[in-house]
Amino acid sequence: MTQEYSTLRNNISMLGRFLGETINDAQGEDILELIENIRKLSRNSRAGDDKARQALLDTLGSISNENIIPVARAFSQFLNLTNIAEQYQTISREHSLAQSSSQSLSELFKRLKEQNASVEEVHKTVEKLLIELVLTAHPTETTRRSLIHKHIEINKCLSKLEHHDLTEKERNIIERLLLRLIAEAWHTNEIRTVRPTPFDEAKWGFAMLENSLWQAVPEFLRQLNETAREFLGYDLPVGLKPVRISSWMGGDRDGNPFVTAQITKKVLYFARWKAADLFLQDISKLADELSMMKCSDEFRDKYGEHLEPYRFVVKNLRNQLTATLAYFDDHLSNRTPRVSESEIILEDNQLWEPLYDCYQSLIQCGMRIIANGSLLDILHRISCFGVTLSQMDIRQESTRHTDAIAEIMRYIGLGDYSQWMEDDKQAFLIRELSSRRPLIPQNWTPSPETKEILDTCKVIAQQKQGVIACYVISMARSASDVLAVHLLLKEAGVPYHIPVVPLFETLEDLDAAEKVMTQLFNVGWYRGVINNRQMVMIGYSDSAKDAGMMAASWAQYRAQEALVNLTEKLGIELTLFHGRGGTIGRGGAPAHAALLSQPPRSLKNGLRVTEQGEMIRFKLGLPAVAVETFDLYASAILEANLLPPPEPKPEWRTIMDELSTISCDIYRGVVRGDKDFVPYFRSATPEQELSKLPLGSRPAKRNPNGGVESLRAIPWIFAWMQNRLMLPAWLGAGAAIRQVIEQGKGDIIHKMCENWPFFSTRIGMLEMVFSKSDTWLSQQYDQRLVKKELWYLGENLRKQLEDDIQTVLSLSHQSELMSDLPWIADSIALRNIYTDPLNLLQVELLHRFRENPEQVNPDVEQALMITITGIAAGMRNTG
């Protein structure tokens, strides 16, 4: 590990040196000297030098407006370069040689073999493996696409430099390219000038699919197959679909008025265009490869006599894909299509069947090695991506459907549906769902809001089955919320069943999830259409914002457990869909640990999870990184199903109930109960300024005039991360543990830490948050930006944070945070030297910004935005 960490430090040092050269060339020696002086003061300040700390405050407090942008950019860009070096290190050859991760698939199979696990059981579990990643456009990706591309190229350079047999000339060429890429990044504006549209966000998602996942999925499936062959002695079926990709980009309209039915349609067209483009590239290469003359009799009977039979089939596909590309290009350009639907590829099987025929014929003719080359990769891509590239989820908030049906009811004279009792709503909806006559009058003109809901349902009706993965209802609270969507889809003429997925988000809704689903399953019509399959989404963001991390975590666990038990009793196959984020306040945790902390049997039908914002890039942005992510997910799912975690003991449940109640009361007592909290929050964080950063297409607030309750969970967490108090991720948790320990239950808490993955993961997450928090920096925000009469709030919170850190250390029996993960502690320590100046500069810039908000110096505004993105890079998981 020491050698590996030394290489990482050397790479970071080299990238930093090249950044220094770039700054010197672009800005001059004086600016570079100022930046270097700030860096040294920050390093010495972190080492406990009080004079250096004061000098750092003085230097950043008196910095001129013309110097703030280059200084902010220098520290921000260094943190981006550090992220690149760290991301590369996880996939470097040195890393692979240094450690065989205990969390990898191969290590899991070794353990299963040692424990004499049933080969048949392992075989069955592997064939049921499903990892479905749902890419979302949550506005936490602060890095522009222009820069992401350069960062990927820098990563490739680091990979080339790892080869120890390079000549001096070869090394110099690579280093010059590195220097050029860093210079290109320096001379590129890191702040978007305009907010991206939902279509821009979708294009970003598809670019990531093209540049990373298109290579990663076949590579992962090869590795999975090799592992199965080595440990189980068999090859996996070619048609196995252990990885699926879905997307919310273009489909998630919850709180985003810019995602319209027309946008959804455009994104679906673009996805098909991009899929045709990618498959056309693959098929064109395959046509060059499959020059063999020998084929099976069955193949010849089906496709005719040809000198090069495989090329004949593949070239036909190439012609169809070319036509498909033209067809969707015409649609995207609002032109009349030049080709008809009968000439193009619209369904996966149109690609799969002829290529699988080629595959089987090659194997029958003794050419297995050729069959298992590019052709197998394409078959795997068809299984995973299909001709739509990804499936799309539609998401909308429950009251929008209620309002739409209420408007229809008023028009036809049946009263105000929104005021009906739940039983009456259900009875009406079931009656209408069972009726053959339409509910909506033909010549009726709905309001724009209701028209948008109905138009979205019509777009769904126009798609072939499987294009839309599911319809997610956010803030679902009742059985009628689910039945209402089914009715709207029926009225739009959707000719097949689409899974309608309730999303339970708040503490109360999670607690009521079992009751709501029981009511639904008791409806005969509903049981008839779902075919004994149900998906339920668990919300992490809003539940944590509503009740605090500890209470939300326990509510999520209990809800999942109750739903698993309910569906098992009824013989219904349950898929739990996890709405996790990158931060602790939104359910984020290292993937392996997070999955093993789920309730027993909750992963038996696979994993469906959102990958959000910047976490898409960190976990999936490079093919090798994505392969490692898939490996970790697969290993955790198989382990959870084959070596399940223990059921929590009754006394553990009792303790968790107590912790949940106490922590929720503490959290809500501060966030809801203190009248000064909202003004304190708005002053002590850059919450209001964040809305100026053109991150995503979705507004930061559901209600622009509302308070904290109307603020979305993502900017809520993002704002607290900026000032290093990290409040949503810990408030209430440590204090609750302390109270329970003081009641004499410390022994049970320690046993929970040692023997229950759910609880030990929560403690580990707290430790990670505490290691990134900083009470001194938080105090600087208060003293410079907050009215004195509100200082008490910050002082109380910081005291609580310090007490909580000691509580967690007492549980881990360590004297320092992250002692058992020293490389993470070292990474945080290194980042702090560069993040601290950005925090202190942000305080100064917020002060200047707020002094005269009507006449802000453009340099101040630009530099403020840079500090926001820089701190996000330093913290890694932003929202």
UniProtKB/Swiss-Prot annotation:
Keyword Lyase appears in the UniProt entry: yes
GO molecular function, one term: phosphoenolpyruvate carboxylase activity
Enzyme class: lyase
A GO CC annotation given for this chain: cytosol
Entry EC no(s): 4.1.1.31
Keyword annotations from UniProtKB, A to Z: Carbon dioxide fixation, Lyase, Magnesium
GO biological process: carbon fixation; oxaloacetate metabolic process; tricarboxylic acid cycle
Entry annotation: catalytic residues: 138, 545
Catalytic reactions of this protein: oxaloacetate + phosphate = phosphoenolpyruvate + hydrogencarbonate
Pfam families named among the record's database cross-references: PEPcase (PF00311)
Keyword Magnesium part of the UniProt annotation: yes
Family: Belongs to the PEPCase type 1 family.
Function text: Forms oxaloacetate, a four-carbon dicarboxylic acid source for the tricarboxylic acid cycle.
Name recorded for this polypeptide: Phosphoenolpyruvate carboxylase
Species of origin: Haemophilus influenzae (strain 86-028NP)
